């Protein structure tokens, strides 16, 4: 399958405008030619043919940010990996996608906070793509092996600015001398250790909006498809979209959502 990256970006942008009911509005979502935005669309990744895809996202602001990271396979745009990324001010997060024994797998050696904490897991920063969303649709031609996910696209959505208003979340998300030792605080914020005891719930488990302000934009990203054996590298900048979430809009819906869910959505 050869994915048309320009058509994909145009289709997503049209869908955003239509869903928001702002077609023709001066405040409509728009692609920022400067590459900075609230939403980043990376139109293509592949691990086929010996290729590896490397990627990065940059927080160009002096605020900590909560970002939804979502990978979708190329056949029917089913989710294959979804997690939350918490960026320090002026942070850069990097990762790669490669083929590991037939399974597309993301690897990161970056200690920026994610929930779940992929860098700090017991698998050397590796996270295999998952087939669950491809197996529960009830539509026969949408079933298939994880090899469907060897190419696709991914998106990053700013869910909000992280603050220290009550729980010190921004401090937990911030590097100190290049190191992170507080990501467990953010993982715990989303956790429910004991279903029978509501008093031990994490603060985000109970209230998504604790220490979260409206998105402000300022994300920048890019990716490259690299084939070491062939000696090739194809690079691109992510398409940056502004106007996705306007806190002044009376219909504004807060975007900070749990990891592993379909919200917030560009659909």
Functional labels for PLM-detected ranges:
Residues 40, 93-95:
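Short strand-edge motifs at loop-to-beta-strand transitions and within beta-strands
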Residues 30, 82-85:
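Beta-strand-rich interaction surfaces with strong enrichment in secreted/lumenal proteins
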Residues 57-63, 73:
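Asparagine-centered strand-capping/turn motif at beta-strand->loop junctions
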Residues 70-83:
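Short beta-strand and strand-turn-strand segments in soluble, beta-rich domains
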């Amino acid at each position: 399958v050869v994915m048309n990256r320009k058509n994909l970006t145009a289709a997503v942008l049209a869908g955003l405008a239509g869903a928001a009911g702002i077609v023709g509005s001066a405040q409509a979502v728009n692609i920022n030619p400067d590459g900075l935005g609230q939403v980043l669309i990376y139109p293509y990744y592949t691990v086929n043919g010996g290729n590896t895809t490397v990627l990065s996202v940059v927080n160009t602001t002096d605020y900590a940010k909560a970002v939804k990271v979502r990978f979708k396979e190329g056949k029917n745009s089913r989710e294959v990996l979804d997690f939350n990324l918490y960026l320090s001010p002026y942070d850069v997060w990097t990762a790669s996608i490669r083929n590991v024994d037939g399974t597309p797998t993301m690897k990161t050696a970056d200690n920026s906070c994610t929930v779940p904490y992929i860098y700090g897991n017991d698998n050397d920063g590796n996270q295999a793509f998952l087939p669950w969303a491809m197996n529960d649709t009830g539509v026969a031609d949408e079933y298939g092996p994880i090899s469907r996910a060897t190419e696709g696209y991914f998106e990053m959505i700013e869910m909000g600015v992280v603050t220290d208003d009550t729980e010190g979340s921004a401090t937990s998300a911030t590097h100190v001398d290049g190191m992170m030792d507080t990501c467990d605080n953010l993982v715990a914020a989303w956790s429910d250790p004991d279903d029978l005891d509501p008093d031990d719930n994490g603060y985000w488990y109970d209230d998504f909006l604790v220490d979260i302000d409206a998105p402000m934009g300022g994300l920048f990203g890019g990716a490259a498809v690299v084939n070491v054996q062939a000696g090739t590298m194809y690079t691109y900048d992510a398409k940056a979209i502004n106007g996705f979430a306007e806190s002044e809009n009376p219909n504004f819906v807060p975007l900070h959502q749990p990891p592993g869910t379909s919200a917030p959505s560009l659909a």
